Amino acid sequence: MRAFMEPMDVGLKAQELSGKYENVVLSRTNDHVVRISRMTEPYFWHLHPDSDETFLGVEGVLILELEHQRIELGPGQMITVPKGTRHRTSPAGSHSINLTFERAEIETVRTDPPAL
């Protein structure tokens, strides 16, 4: 028997987020998840040795810092960070909200910041 399906309002889910950092699974697809994240301060430098990570901006501006590059991701913009790439994210203003597409059992390895 087929499961009952209903569309999800991502905008309403975004309004439910209020903490400094929240990262909530919205959906599962095979061995991947779609998460919605709200952040008000920078996340630590890290990498994922086993999975790419795709970000889709929903609200505000998400700053993606790589070793030699800084990218600003606005609502509706998307980027994929290849596995093994050291990076960190932070909001450009008071907060940012984004969707993240990644393996459900993604490994996160904390790293030192890149040398200046």
Question: Language-model segments: which ranges?
Answer:
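Glycine- and acidic-residue-biased ligand/ion/polar-headgroup-sensing regions
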Residues: 50-52, 56-62, 67-68
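Short acidic-glycine-tyrosine-enriched beta hairpin
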Residues: 68-83
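Residues that act as N-cap/strand-start positions at coil-to-secondary-structure junctions
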Residues: 20-21, 48, 81-83
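A short, N-terminal "cap"/entry segment at the start of jelly-roll beta-barrel domains
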Residues: 1-35, 114-116
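Structural motif
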Residues: 33, 42, 61-63, 70, ...
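A cytosolic small-molecule/anion-sensing beta-strand core signal
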Residues: 30, 58-59, 74-75
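Conserved short histidine dyad/triad with adjacent acidic residue
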Residues: 33-49
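Ligand-binding loop in jelly-roll beta-barrel domains
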Residues: 83-111
